[in-house]
UniProtKB/Swiss-Prot annotation:
Downstream effector molecule involved in the transmission of signals from tyrosine kinase receptors and small GTPases to the actin cytoskeleton. Promotes formation of actin filaments. Part of the WAVE complex that regulates lamellipodia formation. The WAVE complex regulates actin filament reorganization via its interaction with the Arp2/3 complex. Binds actin and the Arp2/3 complex. Interacts with BAIAP2. Component of the WAVE2 complex composed of ABI1, CYFIP1/SRA1, NCKAP1/NAP1 (NCKAP1l/HEM1 in hematopoietic cells) and WASF2/WAVE2. Directly interacts with BRK1. Interacts with human cytomegalovirus protein UL135. Interacts with FNBP1L (via the SH3 domain). GO terms for molecular function: actin binding; Arp2/3 complex binding; protein kinase A regulatory subunit binding; SH3 domain binding. Residues 431-448 form the WH2 domain. Keywords: Actin-binding, Cell membrane, Cell projection, Cytoplasm, Cytoskeleton, Membrane, Phosphoprotein. GO terms for cellular component: basolateral plasma membrane; cell-cell junction; cytoskeleton; early endosome; lamellipodium; ruffle; SCAR complex; synapse. The gene is WASF2. GO terms for biological process: actin cytoskeleton organization; actin filament-based movement; ameboidal-type cell migration; angiogenesis; endocytosis; lamellipodium assembly; lamellipodium morphogenesis; megakaryocyte development. Belongs to the SCAR/WAVE family. The lineage of its organism: Eukaryota, Metazoa, Chordata, Craniata, Vertebrata. InterPro entries: SCAR/WAVE_fam (IPR028288), WH2_dom (IPR003124). This is Actin-binding protein WASF2.
């Protein structure tokens, strides 16, 4: 529906009733001529309005052009007539000048009452006035105007404004939710993508032939292999000593390895000596280790399964450490030498009832050295002198006597004042602490509706440009400030 700005009156020239006259034709001609003259008068009036508006706009445009022309003239004089050789322009004078900055004026409220054209205003004034419902506004409890229930020119604007503010609020809540999730789970964005399953490995295995493909679920068909002492490789499964020939002898070209007699070997230390019943076993192990080129004798066929031929016997487990206060075991037969004495055993320490020393308490004020126990007796001259034993934990100091009177002396003064118990005062309760405790316990405060509405009206502008700019700023901003006038989560009814 187009908005008619100007209507030429009268619209109809000949639609009138004729009076009771004899000359009807002459009367009709006069009425039509009068209506044409009235239309010409209305047209001239509207032409004046149109040209008046054009004159106002042209005058504004001319004033802007004249101001720009004056600035251009001043700049032209400075540019063309300035001689840099004669007049020096200081750097300070250049920096003190402000740079040009254009001020953009947004065109809004195009259909406001102030911008209403005069013809439209005249058309509006011809309409019927609304009923005086504003007289009932003081009697309403909700504070709304009674006339707005009958006619509300700002209804569509308020509806659009409410929708824009709700969208802005939802955007801010969504951003706060994302920030909270990101803060709670910082590694959320570093999720490893799922590996794409392809049959490339399967085809790579099958390109050499189906018989070479090994299944991962089935165990390997090949038994584990073992390496002999002479470098040959053997298998663990189904090894029979009688079916295998002895390993080949070493080449005659290589020099024979030197053989050592048991008498020339040095005696083992006392900590790693073997017991007497293992001498024969130790001798066999040494002989197999010293001369690896000699093959061991083949076991009989009917014997019980034992170590396989060509295999080195497993090393003996390490002997237990020597016990305290026990003499070292005698060396095995054949290895002892009277000229080489065994190393001395580690010195034995006197047993102490407390294995873990408690943390040292503060030193006592006075200790009578006569009450300390005597030091332990030293070892024999042949052994090394043992280190001094750890001191016993100090007990309560004995009360010192003052001379022969037998009277107890005064107790020593305390070491520091830190041992005094501190007096615990009850916390001072005031209105602030009570309010804070109420908030922490989850009590919800009642929100003042009128105050919140007034704050929203003060903060949010009541025009289209301000609302749109606010929404754009919220959408494209990365601010971490969670406090906002749109935050409704902090208060609840």
């Amino acid at each position: 529906m187009p908005l008619v700005t100007r209507n030429i009156e009268p619209r109809h020239l000949c639609r009138q009733t004729l009076p009771s006259v004899r000359s009807e034709l002459e009367c009709m001609t006069n009425i039509t001529l009068a209506n044409v003259i009235r239309q010409l008068g209305s047209l001239s009036k509207y032409a004046e309005d149109i040209f008046g508006e054009l004159f106002t706009q042209a005058n504004t445009f001319a004033s802007r052009v004249s101001s720009l022309a004056e600035r251009v003239d001043r700049l032209q004089v400075k540019v063309t007539q300035l001689d840099p050789k004669e007049e020096e322009v200081s750097l300070q004078g250049i920096n003190t000048r402000k740079a040009f900055r254009s001020s953009t004026v947004q065109d809004q409220k195009l259909f406001d009452r102030n911008s209403l054209p005069i013809p439209v205003l005249e058309t509006y004034n011809t309409c019927d006035t609304p009923p005086p419902l504003n007289n009932l506004t003081p009697y309403r409890d909700d504070g709304k105007e009674a006339l707005k229930f009958y006619t509300d020119p700002s209804y569509f604007f308020d509806l659009w404004k409410e929708k824009m503010l709700q969208d802005t609020k939802d955007i801010m809540k969504e951003k706060r939710k994302h920030r909270k999730e990101k803060k709670d789970n910082p590694n959320r964005g570093n999720v490893n993508p799922r590996k794409i399953k392809t049959r490339k490995e399967e085809w790579e295995k099958m390109k050499m032939g189906q018989e070479f493909v090994e299944s991962k679920e089935k165990p390997s068909r090949y038994p584990p292999t073992l390496v002999y002492q002479n470098g040959s490789i053997g298998s663990v499964e189904n090894v029979d000593a009688g079916n295998y020939p002895p390993p080949p002898q070493s080449d005659s070209i290589s020099p024979p390895s030197p053989s050592f007699s048991e008498d020339n070997l040095p005696p083992p230390p006392a900590e790693f000596s073997y017991p007497a019943d293992n001498n024969q076993r130790a001798g066999l192990k040494r002989s197999s280790v010293v001369s690896p080129s000699h093959p061991p004798p083949a076991p009989p066929l009917g014997s019980a399964p034992g170590p396989k031929p060509g295999f080195a016997p497993p090393p003996a487990p390490p002997p237990p450490p020597p016990m305290i206060n026990t003499p070292p075991p005698p060396p095995p037969g054949g290895f002892g030498s009277p000229a080489t004495p065994p190393p001395p055993s580690p010195p034995s320490f006197p047993p102490h009832p407390d294995f873990a020393a408690p943390p040292p308490p503060p030193p006592p004020p006075a200790v009578d050295y006569s009450t300390l126990p005597p030091p332990p007796l030293s070892q024999s001259a042949g052994g090394a002198p043992p280190p001094p034993p750890p001191p016993p934990p100090p007990g309560p100091p004995p009360p010192p006597f003052s001379g022969a009177d037998g009277q107890l002396a005064a107790p020593p003064p305390p070491l520091s004042d830190t041992t005094k118990p501190k007096s615990s005062l009850p916390p001072v309760s005031d209105a602030r602490s009570d309010l804070l405790s109420a908030i922490r316990q989850g009590f919800q405060l009642r929100r003042v509706e009128e105050q919140r509405e007034q704050e929203k009206r003060d903060v949010v502008g009541n025009d289209v440009a301000t609302i749109l700019s606010r929404r754009i700023a919220v959408e494209y901003s990365d601010s971490e400030d969670d406090s906002s006038e749109f935050d409704e989560d902090e208060w609840s009814d």
